[in-house]
């Protein structure tokens, strides 16, 4: 699955998750929940941001069970966030591996390009 297909799948599942009563289409790792609390963000705000996310790094599925990628999106406050998202196509759901605020020392101003 290429980056464009991953982006479409993430956006679709995020939209469907918002419309569902149980929110079971997006799962969160323990690490991601810890980071969410550390950033003082609401889970729903990040999940809503995934509806318009952009894949900025596509990771090869060499040693990983699920294909994953790094996405960029924004909270309603226009604050950018990055999330590593694993895609479970067989179950039609997402796993948020981690979520964080991109730092200026690691990322260019566009939040899409790593500094070298």
Predicted segments, located by residue:
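Ribonuclease/tRNase effector modules and their secretory precursors
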Residues: 1-116
């Amino acid at each position: 699955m290429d980056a464009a297909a991953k982006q479409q799948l993430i956006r679709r599942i995020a939209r469907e998750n918002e419309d569902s009563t149980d929110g079971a289409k997006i799962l969160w790792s323990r690490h991601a929940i810890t980071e969410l609390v550390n950033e003082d963000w609401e889970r729903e705000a990040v999940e809503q941001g995934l509806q318009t996310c952009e894949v900025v790094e596509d990771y090869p599925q060499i040693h990983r069970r699920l294909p994953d990628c790094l996405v960029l999106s924004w909270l309603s406050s226009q604050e950018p966030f990055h999330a590593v998202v694993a895609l479970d196509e067989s179950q039609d759901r997402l796993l948020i591996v981690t979520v964080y605020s991109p730092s200026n020392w690691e990322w260019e101003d566009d939040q899409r390009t790593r500094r070298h």
